[in-house]
């Protein structure tokens, strides 16, 4: 008998959020640090994400990405806070990929999420694991 090898699960993403001005981008870093402190106090701590202002993306764009793995809900929370603080009004979205260090049936997938920044409401979202199971069971692929 050989015990199963533990697998590591990861969530990857990389996206931009345009906050309108370089001043907003600088203030967004403060919002990020506050959210990171909140995540660190959770049990278990949130994986969070990395944030920076990169010259190649312009001074108003925030580069949001995972650090080995990340938490899409933390990204959504952060973007919603930025939208409220900086009065952003467009739609914004990102996609993410779920992967695993070992071949596992539940180890791969992904999703996407679209927000209306003016209202902070979700426009639509999809998570491929749930979607695939539903369609394979005869459900509506567009539901």
What are these regions (language model features)?
Residues 1-3, 143:
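Glycine- and charge-rich intrinsically disordered segments
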Residues 3-35:
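Short, extreme N-terminal segment that most often corresponds to the first beta-strand
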Residues 32-143:
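Charged interaction segments
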